[in-house]
Amino acid sequence: MLTCSDCSTWEQFVNYVKTRCSKTAFENWISPIQIIEETQEKIRLEVPNIFVQNYLLDNYKQDLCSFVPLDAQGEPALEFVVAEIKKAPAQPIAPREPQESPAETFEESKDFELKLNAAYRFDNFIEGPSNQFVKSAAVGIAGRPGRSYNPLFIHGGVGLGKTHLLHAVGHYVREHHKNLRVHCITTEAFINDLVQHLRLKSIDKMKNFYRSLDLLLVDDIQFLQNRQNFEEEFCNTFETLINLNKQIVITSDKPPGQLKLSERIIARMEWGLVAHVGIPDLETRVAILQHKAEQKGLHIPNEIAFYIADHIYGNVRQLEGAINKLTAYCRLFGKTLTESIVRDTLRELFRSPSKQKVSVESILKSVATVFQVKLQDLKGTSRSKELVLARQVAMYLAKTLITDSLVAIGSAFGKTHSTVLYACKTIEQKIEKDETLTRQISLCKNHIVG
């Protein structure tokens, strides 16, 4: 154990942490902790609330073991006392002060609000098969907040337009329902807001503020995972707003059922409508490229737009990054855009799955993403219609992209070579007539990571 003749072991720990975390984190989580008593066997600490206690143990347990006494199990020998809220002495009854209006509360509680991005509106959201449904749902709830799908839960990968739709809902409601209170916030900001009000002993004020909203927009709810106490407060706020028919829109990188949250909150999130934002298909990617290029004043011929879209397929942000890079190059060197310039400038962004790099596992992951099924189900034995089709597509892609024999491919899938052959013939017949399946297979190919 580290020792110091001039300060207690707890003070040593505090000084150590102070040099290794941000000023805000230190003031919110460490500074409020007061030492009550320190002996060779244990340390008694006063914490303002249970959240601070849990944060200390969750984030600094290993460091604590280097400074404070340990118990028989090798755990930090700490005893916590939650501070009592000191009541003010009784005062003579005075004339009642005017109650703070919801509008005043609203203005005072905007510290953590996420400003709506002026560029994120419905009219510049490029629509395609992968996002048509979720955009329609977002437009629907913006027109009738609290009366359509509540909550609206939007999930999908990074850079596919979830935040764009979230902010678009906020803009529309503010412009068409001017009397409604709108608040947009990230999950991290909600947690920081809660911590701040706990520290200031003004949690009721925060609760009143959130419960006075008509539309709550929450970005990246996945950051609520593994934060049980904060999750409980969010769930309480969530339920109150839903019961008052106030609209909630949530975004996440996963559907509710795949989040590591309590069954209670997952069930609440699945009450309304869960909508997926998928990877844009080729035509949508081309439309996005042309729209972004037009905004930048860059002329991009159709054939070059298709060339770029055929090589960049991960998400919209990558497409936007490509346009930014090409715009800068053409302006700096006074060049007109050509395929050669695109190839040289965007070499690092271009991806192309090769037969040598593609594995069965990467194919399965890609198919699971595009067909929106769980990877373990795809590897399982379920004979449901959607899983059978997804497995057949995976086998078809394996035969197309991997140089192994049918026997080896069948072995990788736990099937016989004849099953693989049947799957391939089935898919080949279907793609001649099924345009949607053809697009899905194209997306799978583009999404494969070696």
Curated annotation (Swiss-Prot):
Subunit composition and interactions: Oligomerizes as a right-handed, spiral filament on DNA at oriC.
Keyword annotations: ATP-binding, Cytoplasm, DNA replication, DNA-binding, Lipid-binding, Nucleotide-binding
Gene: dnaA1
Family of this protein: Belongs to the DnaA family.
Cell compartments where the protein resides: Cytoplasm
GO cellular component: cytoplasm; plasma membrane
Function: Plays an essential role in the initiation and regulation of chromosomal replication. ATP-DnaA binds to the origin of replication (oriC) to initiate formation of the DNA replication initiation complex once per cell cycle. Binds the DnaA box (a 9 base pair repeat at the origin) and separates the double-stranded (ds)DNA. Forms a right-handed helical filament on oriC DNA; dsDNA binds to the exterior of the filament while single-stranded (ss)DNA is stabiized in the filament's interior.
Region (Domain I, interacts with DnaA modulators): 1-85
Organism (species): Chlamydia caviae (strain ATCC VR-813 / DSM 19441 / 03DC25 / GPIC) (Chlamydophila caviae)
Record region (Domain II): 85-114
Gene Ontology terms describing biological process: DNA replication initiation; regulation of DNA replication
Renumbered residue ranges of the record's region Domain III, AAA+ region: 115-330
Superkingdom assignment: Bacteria
NCBIfam families, per database record: DnaA (TIGR00362)
Comment text on domains: Domain I is involved in oligomerization and binding regulators, domain II is flexibile and of varying length in different bacteria, domain III forms the AAA+ region, while domain IV binds dsDNA.
Stored PANTHER family: CHROMOSOMAL REPLICATION INITIATOR PROTEIN DNAA (PTHR30050:SF2)
Listed InterPro entries: AAA+_ATPase, Chromosome_initiator_DnaA, Chromosome_initiator_DnaA-like, Chromosome_initiator_DnaA_CS, DnaA_C, DnaA_dom, DnaA_N_dom, DnaA_N_sf
Disulfides per UniProt: none
PROSITE patterns hit by this protein: DNAA (PS01008)
Region (Domain IV, binds dsDNA), start-end ranges: 331-450
Name by which UniProt lists this protein: Chromosomal replication initiator protein DnaA 1
Molecular function terms from GO: ATP binding; ATP hydrolysis activity; DNA replication origin binding; lipid binding
Binding of ATP, residues: G159, G161, K162, T163
